[in-house]
């Protein structure tokens, strides 16, 4: 089994290291093609009018001066890799509901799906002030990936997985819940302040205060369980 890994937090992010550990625990061959710098909330942006700089940092590890979707394109069509799966993450922050259209993490998995490669986006919801137990998350991810591999994915669909945030320490794998993405929009609010002849608007909405549709991925993840959704192209 060959896993192509990418993310939007950057090639040196701890979430990508945790995803690498999870893949290796499954005995998979791992190739990493990830952004050289953080690309959070870049959506499905791709680069077509300027060259993409790619630095090979190790035998199977490439840093791309581009977006997550760029990384998948480079892997498939420049490096000519033939992965069985593209796994994107593990994002530091949830990608739930409306987030999936903003997320570079999800965009990478979506790009792979467009080209006929099985794909999953994996993210970890964050509660402020609580550290992430990355070693535990790697173990959980291994279990979840085993499940996803065993299940047939409809054509033109990808997996979106969101882990809940629990305090570090021993904890069994939370319940895995199949659910639909929330349809309610994120809360949006700004605070204004003068800036010479212009006005600055600072985003002030709090992610944790977003609407939680009953039975949705938001309700599931915020409630402490693992939200697993199928997204369609």
Identify the role of each PLM range.
Residues 2-3, 13-82:
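A cross-family phosphate/adenosyl-ligand binding-site feature
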Residues 9, 38, 67-68, 91-94, ...:
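Short glycine-rich anion-binding loops that position phosphate/pyrophosphate groups of nucleotides
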Residues 22, 108-112:
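Hydrophobic/aromatic ligand-binding patch that stacks against planar heteroaromatic rings
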Residues 33-35, 65, 88-91, 122-123, ...:
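Short beta-strand segments
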Residues 113-136:
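Glycine-rich phosphate/pyrophosphate-binding loops
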Residues 134-233:
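Electrostatically charged, flexible surface regions
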């Amino acid at each position: 089994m060959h896993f192509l890994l990418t993310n939007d937090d950057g090639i040196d992010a701890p979430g990508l290291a945790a995803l690498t550990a999870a893949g290796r625990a499954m005995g998979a061959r791992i190739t990493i093609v990830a952004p050289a710098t953080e690309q959070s909330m870049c959506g499905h942006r791709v680069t077509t009018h300027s060259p993409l700089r790619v630095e090979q940092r190790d035998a199977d590890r490439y840093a791309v001066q581009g977006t997550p979707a760029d990384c998948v394109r480079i892997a498939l069509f420049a490096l000519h890799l033939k992965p069985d799966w593209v796994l994107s993450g593990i994002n530091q922050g949830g990608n739930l509901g409306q987030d999936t259209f903003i997320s570079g993490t999800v965009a990478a998995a979506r790009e792979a799906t467009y080209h006929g490669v099985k794909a999953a986006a994996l993210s970890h919801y964050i509660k402020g002030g609580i550290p992430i137990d990355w070693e535990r998350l790697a173990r959980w991810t291994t279990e979840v990936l085993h499940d996803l591999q065993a299940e047939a994915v409809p054509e033109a669909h990808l997996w979106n997985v969101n882990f809940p945030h629990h305090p570090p320490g021993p904890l069994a794998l939370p319940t895995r819940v199949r659910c639909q993405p929330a349809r309610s929009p994120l809360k949006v609010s700004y605070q204004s302040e003068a800036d010479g002849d212009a006005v600055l608007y600072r985003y002030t909405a709090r992610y944790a205060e977003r609407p939680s549709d009953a039975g949705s991925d938001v309700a599931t993840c915020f409630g402490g369980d693992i939200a697993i959704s199928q997204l369609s192209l």
